[in-house]
Amino acid sequence: MKCEQCGENIGIGGRRGRTPRFCSSACRQKAYRSRKAGTNSTSKSLVEVFPEPMASVTNWVRADGKRPLCVDGTPASTTSPTTWSPLHEVLSSSAGDGFGIMLGNGAGIACHVLSNALDGDGVLVDWAVKVLVGIESPLFVEVSQNRRGLHVFVKSDERPGARRIMPGGGRHEFYSKGRFIRTTGEVFHLTRFADMRNCQ
């Protein structure tokens, strides 16, 4: 795993079970100042990362860890769409330490959450390969914040969630409503899975 600020290699694991994002307090401070500055070019580039069906909805919020926030820093709720905002407004806010999307309220977007889908080198484990091959037409796939999981966003009607325990401590969860997904915008490319799907 690498420091989000300088790219230096850092270990996995930390206090209270959190995976560290920065190699030092200096890098943490630099990242904080960059977030506060919030340049328009950074916001524009992140908006362009997400596909139109996601970027166009008003289901976005800021985040402090895994806790959703409004753009003004007050708590946001999965059941209160008035606390959500368009993506460009969320990216222009400096509240918290990140951002994410709320699922539901007719947005037509769902998410497969694959926990522990990547090994320590960022390589897909076997069960995750099988799950990914079986997901039709993903909208967007990203690496999760702890860099050991994936978020696979798809178009979907709202329906009950599901959870499966997978080998090696993995989990495959599916949500389409009443759920906050903290996003990273770090694309995980699935080009190589096209041939695998066609061979089945």
Please give the residue ranges for each predicted region.
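BZIP DNA-binding basic region
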Residues: 1-39
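Conserved phosphate/metal-binding and DNA-contacting active-site motifs used
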Residues: 20, 34-200
